[in-house]
Amino acid sequence: MQFTTPLQSAILIKRYKRFLADVRRPDGQIITLHCANTGAMTGCATPGDTVWYSSSDNPKRKYPSSWELTHTQAGDWICINTLRANTLVYEAIAQQRIGEVSGYTKIRSEVRYGAENSRIDLLLQAEDRPDCYIEVKSVTLLQSACGYFPDAVTERGQKHLRELQHQVQSGVRAVLFFAVLHSGITHVRAARHIDPRYAQLLAQASDLGVEVLCYGAQINPAGIRLTQPLPVTV
């Protein structure tokens, strides 16, 4: 995935109200960015880090610039815009770069399904195989080289795991896809210390046949690309 317009850099002053961040541009001007990531963002929003942002010419936007990436003072690259994760996974599957789910001829996004009125991120279909339901999760919480998900208690994420279990029980494929968007993460675990119920449901889902995939990414201001599979412990 290439950014459609060149990103600009600034220094992070603070993130606040979940959706906003103040940054200082190289010319000294302070501007406010929109932050699409509503999670805890632990370790991803340290004042003094370099942030990279995109800008929109849409006059209806109150905050025309969006926080896309962080380059930490430790040298790690992080994709802050969680909306990018679905695009990255879609692109990689469409280009047949994810071997575990290759061979499907149709990809649909945001399809309603399940008993709890959910929308699946990606639905893969082909005439010669069962449908494949894929739920995408962005992983950015780094602790001792390990990535953890979730970074906060997520009832929505718990619901998604229940829905995926039901899909497997109905006879189709279901996949939980961890897109690791932090260059310092080398493997992923369920964050039992943050959301024990989510970790319990993930282990249960895996035992029932929900597939868990995990891929790292190459991240820089030009673009982001899913690259290699990473180990994941449920």
Swiss-Prot record:
CDD domains from the UniProt entry: SfsA-like_bacterial (cd22359)
UniProt-recorded Gene Ontology molecular function terms: DNA binding
Name of a matching Pfam family: SfsA
Domain of life: Bacteria
Residue pairs linked by disulfide bridges in the UniProt entry: none
InterPro entries, alphabetized: SfsA, SfsA_C, SfsA_N
Family: Belongs to the SfsA family.
Xref: PANTHER family: SUGAR FERMENTATION STIMULATION PROTEIN A (PTHR30545:SF2)
Protein known as: Sugar fermentation stimulation protein homolog
Source organism of the structure: Edwardsiella ictaluri (strain 93-146)
